[in-house]
Protein backbone atom coordinates (compact mmCIF):
# COMPACT_ATOMS: atom_id res chain seq x y z
CA UNK A 1 0.00 0.00 0.00
CA UNK A 2 1.29 3.45 -0.88
CA UNK A 3 1.49 5.99 1.90
CA UNK A 4 1.43 9.69 1.18
CA UNK A 5 2.23 12.56 3.55
CA UNK A 6 1.13 15.94 2.15
CA UNK A 7 3.40 18.76 3.35
CA UNK A 8 3.03 22.50 2.81
CA UNK A 9 6.72 23.35 2.57
CA UNK A 10 6.20 27.06 2.02
CA UNK A 11 4.60 29.19 4.73
CA UNK A 12 3.49 26.29 6.94
CA UNK A 13 1.27 26.59 10.02
CA UNK A 14 0.05 30.11 9.25
CA UNK A 15 -2.58 29.87 12.00
CA UNK A 16 0.32 29.99 14.47
CA UNK A 17 1.51 33.37 13.15
CA UNK A 18 0.33 35.23 16.26
CA UNK A 19 2.73 33.20 18.44
CA UNK A 20 5.53 31.95 16.14
CA UNK A 21 7.55 33.80 13.52
CA UNK A 22 7.92 32.27 10.02
CA UNK A 23 11.21 30.50 10.82
CA UNK A 24 9.78 29.02 14.02
CA UNK A 25 6.67 27.81 12.20
CA UNK A 26 8.80 26.22 9.47
CA UNK A 27 11.01 24.46 12.04
CA UNK A 28 7.95 23.25 13.96
CA UNK A 29 6.37 21.90 10.76
CA UNK A 30 9.58 20.08 9.79
CA UNK A 31 9.86 18.42 13.21
CA UNK A 32 6.26 17.20 12.99
CA UNK A 33 6.84 15.97 9.42
CA UNK A 34 9.89 14.01 10.53
CA UNK A 35 7.90 12.45 13.37
CA UNK A 36 5.08 11.39 11.03
CA UNK A 37 7.56 9.96 8.49
CA UNK A 38 9.26 7.91 11.22
CA UNK A 39 5.89 6.65 12.48
CA UNK A 40 4.77 5.57 9.00
CA UNK A 41 8.06 3.70 8.60
CA UNK A 42 7.59 2.09 12.03
CA UNK A 43 4.19 0.89 10.80
CA UNK A 44 5.95 -1.00 8.01
CA UNK A 45 5.17 1.35 5.12
CA UNK A 46 7.42 3.40 2.85
CA UNK A 47 6.16 6.98 2.93
CA UNK A 48 6.17 9.44 0.08
CA UNK A 49 6.23 13.06 1.19
CA UNK A 50 4.20 15.17 -1.23
CA UNK A 51 5.71 18.63 -0.75
CA UNK A 52 4.70 21.96 -2.25
CA UNK A 53 8.39 22.93 -2.58
CA UNK A 54 11.75 21.17 -2.24
CA UNK A 55 12.64 19.96 1.26
CA UNK A 56 16.23 20.54 2.30
CA UNK A 57 16.09 18.81 5.69
CA UNK A 58 17.11 15.16 5.65
CA UNK A 59 14.42 12.52 6.00
CA UNK A 60 14.88 8.80 6.69
CA UNK A 61 16.17 6.90 3.66
CA UNK A 62 12.93 4.90 3.41
CA UNK A 63 11.02 8.09 2.59
CA UNK A 64 10.78 9.50 -0.90
CA UNK A 65 9.87 13.07 -1.79
CA UNK A 66 7.66 14.27 -4.63
CA UNK A 67 7.53 18.01 -5.21
CA UNK A 68 4.30 19.39 -6.65
CA UNK A 69 3.63 23.12 -6.51
CA UNK A 70 -0.12 22.71 -6.88
CA UNK A 71 -2.35 23.35 -3.87
CA UNK A 72 -2.34 20.25 -1.66
CA UNK A 73 -5.90 19.20 -2.54
CA UNK A 74 -5.09 19.09 -6.27
CA UNK A 75 -1.71 17.44 -5.68
CA UNK A 76 -3.17 14.72 -3.44
CA UNK A 77 -6.00 14.08 -5.89
CA UNK A 78 -3.49 13.63 -8.70
CA UNK A 79 -1.67 11.01 -6.61
CA UNK A 80 -4.96 9.29 -5.72
CA UNK A 81 -5.87 9.07 -9.40
CA UNK A 82 -2.58 7.32 -10.12
CA UNK A 83 -2.72 4.59 -7.49
CA UNK A 84 -4.96 2.70 -5.10
CA UNK A 85 -5.08 1.59 -2.30
CA UNK A 86 -3.46 4.49 -0.50
CA UNK A 87 -2.92 5.76 3.02
CA UNK A 88 -2.78 9.55 3.35
CA UNK A 89 -1.55 10.99 6.65
CA UNK A 90 -1.25 14.70 7.34
CA UNK A 91 2.23 15.92 8.29
CA UNK A 92 1.22 17.65 11.51
CA UNK A 93 0.31 14.71 13.74
CA UNK A 94 3.10 14.45 16.32
CA UNK A 95 1.05 12.08 18.52
CA UNK A 96 0.50 9.57 15.69
CA UNK A 97 1.44 6.00 16.58
CA UNK A 98 2.19 3.01 14.36
CA UNK A 99 -0.84 1.31 15.96
CA UNK A 100 -3.06 4.13 14.65
CA UNK A 101 -1.82 3.45 11.13
CA UNK A 102 -2.37 -0.27 11.54
CA UNK A 103 -5.96 0.43 12.60
CA UNK A 104 -6.57 2.55 9.50
CA UNK A 105 -5.23 0.01 7.03
CA UNK A 106 -6.47 -3.18 8.74
CA UNK A 107 -10.02 -2.89 7.46
CA UNK A 108 -11.29 -3.94 4.05
CA UNK A 109 -13.55 -0.87 3.87
CA UNK A 110 -13.37 1.29 0.76
CA UNK A 111 -12.61 4.30 2.96
CA UNK A 112 -11.44 4.63 6.57
CA UNK A 113 -11.10 8.17 7.95
CA UNK A 114 -9.46 9.54 11.10
CA UNK A 115 -11.18 12.89 11.78
CA UNK A 116 -9.51 15.86 13.41
CA UNK A 117 -11.03 17.63 16.41
CA UNK A 118 -11.87 20.71 14.36
CA UNK A 119 -13.72 18.81 11.63
CA UNK A 120 -10.73 18.24 9.38
CA UNK A 121 -9.25 14.97 8.16
CA UNK A 122 -6.11 13.78 9.94
CA UNK A 123 -5.63 10.62 7.89
CA UNK A 124 -7.48 8.18 5.68
CA UNK A 125 -7.02 4.91 3.88
CA UNK A 126 -8.82 4.47 0.58
CA UNK A 127 -9.25 1.44 -1.60
CA UNK A 128 -11.68 3.28 -3.85
CA UNK A 129 -9.91 4.50 -7.02
CA UNK A 130 -12.50 7.25 -7.60
CA UNK A 131 -12.15 8.84 -4.13
CA UNK A 132 -10.93 12.45 -4.13
CA UNK A 133 -10.12 14.84 -1.29
CA UNK A 134 -11.32 18.33 -0.46
CA UNK A 135 -9.22 19.82 2.34
CA UNK A 136 -11.21 23.02 2.84
CA UNK A 137 -13.52 23.65 5.80
CA UNK A 138 -14.95 20.60 7.52
CA UNK A 139 -13.23 18.14 5.20
CA UNK A 140 -14.14 15.14 7.35
CA UNK A 141 -17.83 15.65 6.58
CA UNK A 142 -17.08 16.21 2.89
CA UNK A 143 -15.00 13.04 2.75
CA UNK A 144 -17.69 10.99 4.50
CA UNK A 145 -20.25 12.18 1.97
CA UNK A 146 -18.01 11.37 -1.01
Identify the function of each model-found stretch.
Residues 29-46:
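A short, N-terminal amphipathic alpha-helix
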Residues 60-87:
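Short phosphate-binding loop-to-helix
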Residues 2-6, 33, 47-48:
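Hydrophobic targeting segments
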Residues 124-146:
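Short, glycine-/small-residue-rich phosphate/pyrophosphate-handling segment
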Residues 45-64:
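Acidic donor-binding segment of Leloir-type glycosyltransferases
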Residues 94-120:
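Conserved donor-nucleotide/metal-binding helix-loop-beta segment in metal-dependent transferases, i.e.
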Residues 1-16:
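N-terminal nucleotide-binding beta1-loop-alpha1 segment
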Residues 89-91:
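Active-site acidic Asp-centered loop
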Amino acid sequence: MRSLIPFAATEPKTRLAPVLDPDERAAFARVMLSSVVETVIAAGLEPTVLATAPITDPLPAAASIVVDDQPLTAAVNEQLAADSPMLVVMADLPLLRAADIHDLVATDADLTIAPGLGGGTNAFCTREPAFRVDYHGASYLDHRAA
